[in-house]
């Protein structure tokens, strides 16, 4: 696979960016209002910060960023063969990027895991274009799976 993604809810995006820039000795790869992501090389990590007041200090979701759509498909097939269900999202907009992804179902503690690849950059945070909405689940089916705003990207 590619690299692990950790998406955190933060109270103050500017304060969080300052802290994580120092922690990982790097600047954000992408910065938008209420949003930042870091492509950390060592350790290999995609760190996503989502300003979500009242939810700071909690995990938004976890993910694995992979190189291409073929890897998304192969991973989804492998997990299906292992008995894990998933919810497919193709061509969805999330975190200022158009993505092909799926959400893995059945984590024992309810964690939200996505496996995704970025197809292209986007000027909007999510599919609806509501940049102030910290949820970008993309489809009604995925939104019903993820439940609350804090539980999905």
Explain the meaning of each model-derived region.
Residues 2-46:
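Core segments of cupin and vicinal oxygen chelate
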Residues 3-11, 39, 54-153:
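Vicinal oxygen chelate
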Residues 16-18, 77-87:
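Short, positively charged
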Residues 25-30, 67, 91-94:
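Short linear motifs in intrinsically disordered
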Residues 46-50, 114:
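Conserved beta-strand in the GNAT
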Residues 50-53, 118-120:
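Acetyl-CoA-dependent GNAT
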């Amino acid at each position: 696979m590619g690299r692990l993604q950790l998406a955190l809810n933060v109270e103050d995006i500017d304060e969080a960016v300052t802290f994580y820039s120092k922690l990982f000795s790097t600047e954000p790869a992408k910065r938008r209002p209420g949003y930042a992501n870091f492509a950390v090389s060592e350790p290999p990590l995609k760190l996503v910060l989502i300003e979500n007041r009242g939810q700071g200090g909690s995990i938004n979701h976890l993910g694995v960023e992979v190189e291409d759509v073929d890897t998304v498909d192969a991973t989804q097939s492998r997990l299906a063969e292992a008995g894990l269900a998933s919810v497919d999202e193709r061509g969805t907009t999330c975190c200022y990027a158009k993505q092909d992804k799926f959400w893995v179902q059945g984590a024992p503690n309810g964690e939200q895991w996505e496996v995704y690849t970025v197809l292209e950059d986007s000027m909007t945070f999510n599919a609806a274009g509501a940049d102030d909405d910290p949820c970008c689940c993309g489809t009604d089916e995925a939104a019903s799976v993820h439940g609350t705003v804090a539980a999905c990207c």
